[in-house]
Amino acid sequence: MTINKLAIIGGSGLYDVEEFKDRELIDLKTPWGEPSDQILKTKDNTKEVYFLPRHGRGHFLSPSNINFRANIDALKQLGVTDIVSVSAVGSLKEDLPPGKFVIVDQFIDRTFSRIKTFFDDEIVAHVSMAHPTSNGLMNACEEAIKKSNIDYQRNGTYVAVSYTHLTLPTSQYV
């Protein structure tokens, strides 16, 4: 039987969550360099949970400087099987006002200045992205959101861009 290990990639505010009682900070190195920051190991009831601040504690890494490969590899070294990524983003849709949580089921990567693969010159591999999210994780997120009485929407598409400002209104037609 597989024991799932959860990691959350998100903002630095989760370091201050009171429910995270037992805390251990882990330093890891990867073949792709160092991850964004130390990884927080904690427990939620009896389950291990890991947290990695995408931009580093203190928010010192801009989106274009995040070492995604090192972040994912570090979590893999810890035996993480499931990752939930939480982001504060803008929306071009009126029915997605500020504060509404979206459980995405698709994404579009419109970035252009970062490495997007673990497979470099020596390995050629094709990874299907037809269904990039896990129904099990989406269901677990939805249950937690319902318990917290947060306004949310199930299913949506996240579009990643290579700049730090919000997109133009015409971007909705891309």
Language model: regions and residue ranges:
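Metabolite-binding pocket within alpha/beta catalytic cores that recognizes anionic/polar moieties
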Residues: 2-129
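Polyanion-binding loop/helix "lid" in catalytic or ligand-binding cores
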Residues: 122-133, 159-161, 171
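Active-site rim beta-loop-alpha module in soluble metabolic enzymes
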Residues: 134-166
